A protein has these predicted regions:
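Non-catalytic substrate-recognition/targeting regions of SAM-dependent transferases
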Residues: 109-114, 118-120, 140-205
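Short, charged, low-complexity patches
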Residues: 78, 135-139, 143
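Short helix/loop capping segments that flank catalytic or ligand/cofactor-binding pockets
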Residues: 33, 53, 137-138, 205
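Structural motif
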Residues: 42, 125-126, 158-160
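A short interface-forming secondary-structure element
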Residues: 123-136
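Non-catalytic accessory regions of SAM-dependent methyltransferases
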Residues: 1-123, 181, 190-192
Length: 205
């Protein structure tokens, strides 16, 4: 028996979910069974209770549920997120090649099934933006895994900077702000970005 609260949706919501749309809007939810807190995982089901997907819930948002999986066998532990990160990074390295891999978008939100998360890489600096509460609550684990995987791939990462200075976070019930992520990686502000610009300028000559 699954442990997640059930969110029953309208026929419109069902069609959207079956079509691969990753969002369930508030007006598409008709009934809720079970207890939950904002940021928790919940199951999305049809009016007859048939499983459609699992995602992060947030009552503060117009996007009530952000779906992360449509597989009932998935266990959403650290190993799950590590596999998903590895897949996204391996894909970019394969498609873009080593040279472009050092300056690109590593994680692109719903496209990589990390709803509301963007991660850009500029040489040895990562810049992130988190726009969903479910990811926000798990970002410590995700960022540490991301850095670990990149280092295992032979990529040097010295800093991770959070650019969360966007108003949409307020609509999601989160605070705005920008700062270095709390690890021992953080360089002096400005030092890395200056180096990035110089390196990219040299590459273009």
């Amino acid at each position: 028996m699954r442990k997640y609260a059930k969110f029953f949706v309208t026929p419109k919501g069902e069609r959207a979910a079956r079509g691969g749309h990753p969002w369930v809007f508030g007006e598409e939810v008709t009934k809720i069974e079970g207890e939950y807190a904002n940021g928790d995982l919940v199951d999305v089901v049809t009016s007859k209770g048939k499983y459609l997907g699992t995602g992060f819930v947030n009552d503060h948002s117009k996007i009530r549920v952000r779906i992360i999986s449509t597989n009932t066998n998935d266990k959403f532990d650290e190993a799950f997120w590590e596999r998903r990160l590895r897949y996204a990074l391996d894909y970019r390295l394969t498609v873009m090649g080593e040279r472009d891999f050092n300056c690109c978008r590593l994680i692109f939100g719903e496209a990589d099934m990390f709803p509301g998360l963007t991660v850009d890489r500029y040489n040895d600096l990562l810049v992130t933006q988190t726009l969903s509460l479910g990811i926000e609550m798990r970002k410590q684990m995700l960022f540490e895994l991301l850095i670990k995987i990149l280092r295992e791939m032979g990529q040097e990462i010295r800093g991770l900077y959070e650019r969360n200075d966007v108003r949409i976070r307020l609509l999601e019930g989160m605070e705005e702000g920008k700062h270095w992520f709390a690890t021992d990686l953080c360089p002096e502000p400005g030092a890395v970005t200056t180096e990035i610009v110089e390196n990219r300028s040299e590459e273009r000559r």
